[in-house]
Amino acid sequence: MDFLSHAMLSRSESTQILCELSQIDESTMDPQYTEDDVLARLFVFSSSSPQTVLNVKKYEDVSVGRSNTCNYQLLQFTASYKHFRVYSVLIDDDMDPLVYCEDQSSNGTFLNHRLIGKGNSVLLSDGDILDVRHCASFLFQQKYTTDNDFHHEYAGERFNITQRLLGIGGFSRIYMAMDNNTGGQYACKIIDKKKISTKRFFEDHEMTILRKLDHPNIIKVNMEYNSETQFFIFEEMVTGGDLFSYLTKLGTVPEVTTLFIMFQILQGLKYLHEQNIIHRDLKLENILIASSSDTIFRIILTDFGVARCMQKGKRLSTFVGTPEYTAPEIQRLKGRSQVEKENSSGYGKEVDLWSLGVIMFLLLSGNSPSFADGVKEKQVDFRDPVWKSVSRQAKDLISNLLKTNPPDRFTVKQCLSHPWFARHSSRLTKLYETRILKPLKHSRL
């Protein structure tokens, strides 16, 4: 059978599904689920079995394939042992859960007639149809809040900006956008110029910085667009959530997983600092996960809204960042007049390393750092029982990152030379090349 005939058959099957849907008892389609932990549902249509409903629950994957361990087993040999999985990401309590489908198959999983591709994940929207051709089709149903403030001035032809809200920031909202040429999904950050002090704030800083960045551990910008009152940044769709949702799910992150997470963050920071760029707002929410299917995943630094390019010999003196992650030298600027700030010693790249120490402490313990009085300065408090299972090297690295005196704080280079990384250096490098760089290069061809 040629490709066209195959595609026509699939469309015919989908049409048949839609006909069957019109005959379904509406009570079974009620979006008000009886179970609190049910986030969405998949209605299964197959000629070889009766209609089935699969519930997508909080922190539970729904797997489909030939394996008898799958939530829904496909009997046809054209299906893969593990064909696809549906999983959810909960960003925070104020946001609707985001539900994704990861294609794990050799023969392909199709979303609304478009091939997803093995190893790729897509965001699912209410009414989407997943197809495992010649096996079964799955209608996705999810009730989510419609953004009443949705409005945009994008007049370009390449993208269609949908009302699927992915995130909310101080000056912006992030929506799902579709590439009209390829059907690919993107995250569109819409910045409201009326909410910022000057129109040049983001245009001169965030986009100036993002335009010249090209690194596996830094968010990739595909396009930008400028209108009278809005600024648009079209970024790669990242489908694994962020480190905050990841930590919330696990409670604490195993040390071996934290090791590779920290290694990647440092690769991104090394790249930024070599170009004299300071992020200034590193936190769990601004570090994304490319995929949640494994303990080995790509880490992506995002949100460069307050990032700055440092001029040689100059220090920064603006009070910015998130208090929980902010370095002491930035905290000391709070409440000071502009003259006092300018006369202060300011701060530099060291602030990103303090934030990194807070992140590492949070990942390993699930709590924010606390300090005990020391002889010369406050010491990181590791008395909580959770630290008994954490290595001495990991705690030593945290202590060197959370030095209140900036010159005493570890640099990126010192971090990567620390025994916690150094004793695993060759393995970390190989893992980074084979599991991060190689797949990414292949996906961007």
Swiss-Prot record:
Primary enzyme class: transferase
Matching entries from Gene3D superfamilies are given as:
2.60.200.20, Phosphorylase Kinase, domain 1, Transferase(Phosphotransferase) domain 1
What EC number(s) does this enzyme carry? 2.7.11.1
List GO BP terms, alphabetically. Answer: meiotic recombination checkpoint signaling; positive regulation of initiation of premeiotic DNA replication; positive regulation of reciprocal meiotic recombination; reciprocal meiotic recombination
UniProt-listed SMART domains: FHA, S_TKc
Which intervals hold domain Protein kinase?
A: 160-421
> Which residues participate directly in catalysis?
281 (proton acceptor)
Give TM segment ranges. none
**Sorted UniProt keywords:** ATP-binding, Kinase, Meiosis, Nucleotide-binding, Serine/threonine-protein kinase, Transferase
Molecular function (GO) terms for this protein are: ATP binding; protein serine kinase activity; protein serine/threonine kinase activity
Reactions the enzyme catalyzes: L-seryl-[protein] + ATP = O-phospho-L-seryl-[protein] + ADP + H(+); L-threonyl-[protein] + ATP = O-phospho-L-threonyl-[protein] + ADP + H(+)
Q: Which Pfam families match?
A: FHA, Pkinase
The entry sums up its family as follows:
Belongs to the protein kinase superfamily. CAMK Ser/Thr protein kinase family. CHEK2 subfamily.
Q: What does this protein do?
A: Probable protein kinase required for meiotic recombination.
Protein name as it appears in the record: Meiosis-specific serine/threonine-protein kinase mek1
Organism equals Schizosaccharomyces pombe (strain 972 / ATCC 24843) (Fission yeast)
The gene behind this protein is mek1
